[in-house]
A protein has these predicted regions:
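Active-site regions of oxyanion-processing enzymes, predominantly non-cytosolic
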Residues: 279-280, 285-289
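Acidic/aromatic-lined carbohydrate-recognition and catalytic surfaces
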Residues: 1-265, 269-270, 281, 292-303
Length: 303
């Protein structure tokens, strides 16, 4: 850790230690700081690079740190033990005995209970990593294979419930299988609460998305952007006539019903971090970062 980064870490520890009081026992406090120190360099670099020039950068970091503390305090003890095991096992995910299996829940076993009933079969195959393709609540109608989520915290009703997912994660972990879930980062469905509130003209939620009153800027972007689905969804922007009362263009990299999130807005980062902690504390041992190359929009680039 470089001296200036070490100084930043020590300052965080000095200023923020009070947040841990009453949340955790002394052992967990010590483990939290050890793990935070281990990953602080990466965290500091990313946040400083993307948001360090903001006047409220320290305030935003304080909010993020507070949520880290809360999420760790809420984390089940077996998952805390697993965290330590993985931290002590270099490149555990690249071991030669790691064998992955990817499937849609309904195609493989009907629903989440069905997957629990097939864990022994997965063990026989030597599977140690199970990636269940998107199983959270999608929008009605076309949903890009489940990647157009209307509710990122609710399981599709035909597959089960959040409690079913939690139980499955426990059963898999006890059999030595890591559960992988998709963290859909780039977009939400237009039926998602954030999109609906943006549609209604709420300024807070309009800022969650990339929207344009006219084509001046978006035409400049369009000159260097590829088309992901040129036949079925040409272009990268969609006109939404009812948005905010006067209509606006929305950045839609994939389909017109998938609205790209605006990561230059720290509020979006806080929301996604909350979702990440939610899935991790449910028992997801791996989060697949969907469409990550498209997150940060820059004029003149291909994303």
């Amino acid at each position: 850790m470089a001296p200036e980064v070490r100084a930043a870490f020590e300052n965080v520890r000095k200023v923020e230690s009070y947040r841990l009081e009453g949340w955790m026992n002394p052992r967990d406090v010590d483990v939290f700081w050890l793990r935070f120190e281990r990953y602080f360099d990466d965290l500091h670099y990313a946040l400083h690079t993307l948001y360090g020039d903001r006047a409220d950068a320290l305030e935003q970091f304080g909010r993020l740190f507070g949520r880290m503390v809360a999420a760790y305090a809420e984390r089940p003890d077996p998952l805390k033990v697993l965290d330590l095991e993985r931290q002590l096992t270099a490149r555990w995910f690249q071991r030669t005995n790691m064998v992955g299996y990817t499937c849609y829940t309904d195609h493989f076993a009907g629903d989440l209970s069905g997957v629990r009933g097939r864990i022994a079969y997965l063990q026989e195959l030597g599977i140690t990593y199970l990636h269940l393709m998107p199983l959270m609540q999608p929008r009605p109608g076309p949903d890009d294979g489940g990647y157009a989520m209307a509710d990122c915290r609710a399981v599709r009703s035909d597959l089960g419930t959040i409690e079913d997912l939690r139980k499955l994660a426990v059963d898999l972990r006890e059999r030595g299988i890591s559960l992988c879930l998709d963290l859909v980062l780039n977009h939400v469905a237009r039926e998602h609460e954030w999109a609906q509130r943006a549609l209604a003209g709420e300024e807070r939620y309009l800022a969650y998305f990339h929207t344009f009153a006219d084509r001046t800027l978006l035409d400049a972007h369009e000159r260097t952007l590829p088309e992901v689905f040129p036949d079925e969804a040409p272009g990268n922007f969609t006109w939404v006539p009812q948005m905010a009362g006067a209509g606006r263009w929305v950045w839609t990299t994939f389909h017109d019903y998938q609205w790209d999130l605006n990561y230059s807005n720290p509020e979006v980062v806080h929301e996604i971090v909350e979702l990440m902690f939610f899935l991790a504390n449910l028992g997801a041992g791996v989060l697949r970062l969907d469409a990550a190359p498209f997150l940060w929009k820059r004029m003149g680039t291909n994303c």
